[in-house]
């Protein structure tokens, strides 16, 4: 595994690899790697000649007062995990190399960015779209891999790729869960023991919502049931959203249809957790 820190060098390596006809699979991450990330890497290894992983805690996707400073960082441990998987390149840029003084260009995917998480994290998806756009230009992947846990993010990136004519295939892989159903997330590290136990209610509520939809319940009644489940969990400090949405538009669904997105964002203590299920 070769570690590259300078965007220009990473771009030159990628350009040469593509010129030689090598397919590049790319997994952009913010580090604190867990089994969810590793599953994306394994899939990329199966489908590409070369696998490149980036680790970059992107400041532009954190709003003021969010957890940018305390976001978990352990690059040495991450390197060990990546070496064990025998990836080809780790791209490890610093903030100044990607956002030098005078930087002033951002990518905004209108519409989708203003729904769900976008309501509670203003500017978040502008930061996500911008950094992914930059990374795609540097790494030049044929395929890029994302997890379904960040469903809205993957939808926004697909839209950006389509609208801006990127030659990248976006592959969204299933959410990887702990044994008790909690979606794997770097932010789970923030939870104390009681909060960690409390967090299992998210998946339980999603599964209950799935069951009710499959039994023919109306989406609005499913939403009410999910909120009821969360309100009975004393450690939940705030329910930001929980309900039934259209998987393409992210609009709330009020009538029955063929496919649904069940999605949740809430805070347990100071930790914001998200999760979702697709129901067909």
Curated annotation (Swiss-Prot):
Pfam families: Pantoate_ligase
Organism domain of life: Bacteria
Key words of the record: ATP-binding, Cytoplasm, Ligase, Nucleotide-binding, Pantothenate biosynthesis
Reaction equations catalysed: (R)-pantoate + beta-alanine + ATP = (R)-pantothenate + AMP + diphosphate + H(+)
Alphabetized InterPro entries for the sequence: Cyt_trans-like, Pantoate_ligase, Pantoate_ligase_C, Rossmann-like_a/b/a_fold
Annotated EC: 6.3.2.1
Record-listed beta-alanine binding positions: 61
The keyword Cytoplasm is assigned to this record: yes
Binding residues for ATP: 30-37, 147-150, 176, 184-187
Residues that, per the record, bind (R)-pantoate: 61, 153
GO biological process, any: pantothenate biosynthetic process
Pathway involvement of the protein, from the record: Cofactor biosynthesis; (R)-pantothenate biosynthesis; (R)-pantothenate from (R)-pantoate and beta-alanine: step 1/1
PANTHER family found in the cross-reference section: CYTIDYLATE KINASE/PANTOATE-BETA-ALANINE LIGASE, PANTOATE--BETA-ALANINE LIGASE
Known role: Catalyzes the condensation of pantoate with beta-alanine in an ATP-dependent reaction via a pantoyl-adenylate intermediate.
Remarks, miscellaneous: The reaction proceeds by a bi uni uni bi ping pong mechanism.
Subunit-level organization: Homodimer.
Record's protein name: Pantothenate synthetase
Native species: Thermodesulfovibrio yellowstonii (strain ATCC 51303 / DSM 11347 / YP87)
The gene coding this protein: panC
């Amino acid at each position: 595994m070769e570690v590259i820190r300078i965007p220009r060098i990473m771009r030159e390596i990628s350009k040469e690899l593509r010129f030689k006809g090598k397919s590049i699979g790319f997994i952009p991450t913010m580090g604190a790697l867990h089994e969810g990330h590793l599953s994306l890497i394994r899939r990329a290894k199966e489908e590409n000649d070369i696998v490149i992983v980036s680790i970059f805690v992107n400041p532009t996707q954190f709003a003021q007062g969010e957890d940018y400073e305390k976001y978990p960082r352990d690059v040495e441990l991450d390197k060990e995990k990546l070496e064990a998987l025998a990836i080809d390149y780790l791209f490890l840029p610093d903030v100044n190399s990607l956002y030098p003084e005078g930087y002033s260009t951002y990518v905004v995917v209108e519409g989708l960015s203003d729904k769900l998480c976008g309501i509670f994290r203003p500017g978040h998806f502008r930061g996500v779209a911008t950094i992914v756009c930059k990374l795609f230009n540097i790494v030049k992947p044929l395929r890029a891999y994302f997890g379904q846990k960040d469903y809205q993010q993957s939808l926004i990136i697909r839209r950006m790729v389509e609208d801006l004519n990127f030659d990248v295939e976006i592959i969204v892989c299933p959410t990887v869960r702990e044994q008790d159903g909690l979606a794997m997330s770097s932010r789970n590290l923030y939870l104390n023991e009681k909060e960690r136990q409390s967090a299992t209610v998210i998946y339980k509520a999603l599964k209950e919502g799935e069951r009710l939809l499959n039994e023919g319940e109306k989406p609005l009644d499913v939403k009410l049931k999910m909120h009821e489940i969360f309100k009975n969990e004393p450690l939940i400090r705030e329910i930001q959203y929980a309900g039934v949405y259209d998987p393409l538009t992210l609009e709330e669904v009020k009538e029955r249809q063929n496919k649904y997105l069940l999605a949740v964002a809430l805070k347990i203590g100071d930790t914001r957790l998200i999760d979702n299920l697709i129901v067909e």
